[in-house]
Amino acid sequence: SPYVTHGVINEIEIIKKSLAKFSFSKNEKFIQEVLWRTYWKGWLELRPNVWTDYLVGLNNMKEKFRDKKEYLNAIEGNTNIECFNEWVKELKENNYLHNHTRMWFASIWIFTLDLPWQLGAEFFMQHLYDGDAASNTLGWRWVAGVQTQGKHYLASEWNIKKFTNNRFNNIKLNENVPPKVSEKTYSIVKQNFANPQDIDQNNLLVFENNLSLETTDFKNNKFKKVYLVSNKNENRSIK
């Protein structure tokens, strides 16, 4: 939901609410996915150059593929792969896809349609109500094989048929293709929050994806000014 993506509801609250309603055994997989979301945030914070390089690559690919038919067909759901077309429609109409479906979608985009993962990651962020920059970007990198070098995710016809109860048939996918290659590695960038400058501590800077102020250590502080760093909604399909 948009409440999750903007941090109005944080991950701890989600897990607590879920455990209050369902047993841990029924919740375990869901909790794992929530924790992965948190893990990816921390991972990217320590390696900010991954995000910088993604944006550079995205701009290059947008220029290169802007008018290419295969790209336009993909984002319009007009390919020869029925299940993919249905997922494009579902994503645009419901602003959501099941986690397993997101993996299939990304794999087909990268390895069967042969489109850049950066464009696929952007497409998700344009439409997912629960889109998170870290988990989305790194998830697409992982499917492509550049997040964990040499390890990629390939969607298969039998897997899609099994978990969609044979809803889709005759799914022609590229199921024998090596991972994408990236020789660049990213080291941890040490975070130094000891700023020697004399900063007015009566001001608060808030980002639009972390709005759970009631759960912070400074919820009772009296700030002179609160600054909100926000992306305009027209930059994303969040209404």
What do these predicted regions represent?
Residues 1-99, 107, 111-239:
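C-terminal catalytic domain of photolyase/cryptochrome flavoproteins
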Residues 103:
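Short, solvent-exposed turn/loop segments enriched in Gly/Ser/Thr/Pro and often Arg
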